[in-house]
């Protein structure tokens, strides 16, 4: 199987024509039409798509991942905007937090742009990735872009070494104190298009392991349209814990604007916002632990 780790001679992803970009912009999409995304977003038909199922027995231990320690230099964000976009909850980070080391190109910094959440209507499902075909109730994505090579996240999307995403599985248990700043205001942004500024958010509270050694790595894509490839995925082995009350706050959110007339058969509840797992193809999943 081919090792798709960062290499110097990676083939560049083809640039989109201007009319193709215009066609994709503003297109409505939903998770009920997930299998049809490729009709409008051609990248969704790519060979190296995300999410995937992680088979822990087939993951290849790669000690080189520990040669340069994975190093998140995150700072507390002041006045962060939390938004319900009808597909997920986004926490937009304004402070400059960066990620480097580990599987990322040496000397490159990846700036943390946002945190996104994916969850199920029930605790038996919700995560985008699965581990040995087991799903978690929720998955968090810390989305970074390569600020060494590019001037913005828009420039970085779809480019080799452009995007790095830390994925964190979430299980039900004790309350997560670091996420209280978000869960406490979700009732104020129940409907699509609503947003609220929170005074303080610390992304460091989302990192489960101080040593940051137990993670898997593979090359994939964005899990939402346009599903562009060129994404390095870093998935931590040990999940975060949130309380049942906290996840229920997410399950009260809506996919529509307030007062909108719902189509028949749609209850408007925001949940099950995960893409089905995609074929691994010839990709190798690397592990930083044995």
UniProtKB/Swiss-Prot annotation:
Source organism: Homo sapiens
Chain ranges of the Alpha-carbonic anhydrase domain: 27-289
UniProt keyword RNA-binding, yes or no: no
Protein's name according to its UniProt entry: Carbonic anhydrase-related protein
Residues annotated to bind Zn(2+): 118, 141
Chain segments carrying region Disordered: 1-26
Any single Pfam family the record assigns to this protein: Carb_anhydrase
Active-site residues, record numbering mapped to chain: 87 (proton donor/acceptor)
Keyword Plastid: no
Acidic residues: compositionally biased ranges: 16-26
SUPFAM superfamilies from the UniProt entry: Carbonic anhydrase (SSF51069)
GO cellular component terms, semicolon-separated: cytoplasm
Protein family according to the UniProt entry: Belongs to the alpha-carbonic anhydrase family.
Cited CDD domains: alpha_CARP_VIII
Its job: Does not have a carbonic anhydrase catalytic activity.
GO aspect biological process, one term: positive regulation of calcium-mediated signaling
């Amino acid at each position: 199987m081919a090792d798709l780790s960062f290499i110097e001679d990676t083939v560049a992803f083809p640039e989109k024509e201007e009319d193709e970009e215009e066609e994709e912009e503003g297109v409505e999409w939903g998770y009920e039409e997930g299998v049809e995304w490729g009709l409008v977003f051609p990248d969704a038909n790519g060979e190296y798509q995300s999410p995937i199922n992680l088979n822990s027995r087939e993951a290849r231990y790669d000690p080189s991942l520990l040669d340069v320690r994975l190093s998140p230099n995150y700072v507390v964000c002041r006045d962060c905007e939390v938004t319900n976009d009808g597909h997920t909850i986004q926490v937009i980070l304004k402070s400059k937090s960066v990620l480097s080391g580990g599987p990322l190109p040496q000397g490159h910094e990846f700036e943390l742009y946002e945190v996104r959440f994916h969850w199920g209507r029930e605790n038996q499902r919700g995560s985008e990735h699965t581990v040995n075909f087991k799903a978690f109730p929720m998955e968090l994505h810390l989305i970074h872009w390569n600020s060494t090579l590019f001037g913005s996240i828009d420039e970085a999307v779809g480019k080799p070494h452009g995007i790095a995403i830390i994925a964190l599985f979430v299980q039900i248990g004790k309350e997560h104190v670091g996420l209280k700043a978000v869960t406490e205001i979700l009732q104020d942004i129940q409907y699509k298009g609503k947003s609220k500024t929170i005074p303080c958010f610390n992304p460091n509270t989302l990192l489960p392991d101080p040593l940051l050694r137990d993670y898997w790595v593979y090359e994939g894509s964005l899990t939402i349209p346009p599903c562009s490839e060129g994404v390095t995925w870093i998935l931590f082995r040990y999940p975060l814990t949130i309380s049942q009350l906290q996840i229920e706050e997410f399950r009260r959110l809506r996919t529509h604007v307030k007062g909108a007339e719902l189509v028949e058969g749609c209850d408007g509840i925001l949940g099950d916002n995960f893409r089905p797992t995609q074929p691994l193809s010839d990709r190798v999943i690397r592990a930083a632990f044995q």
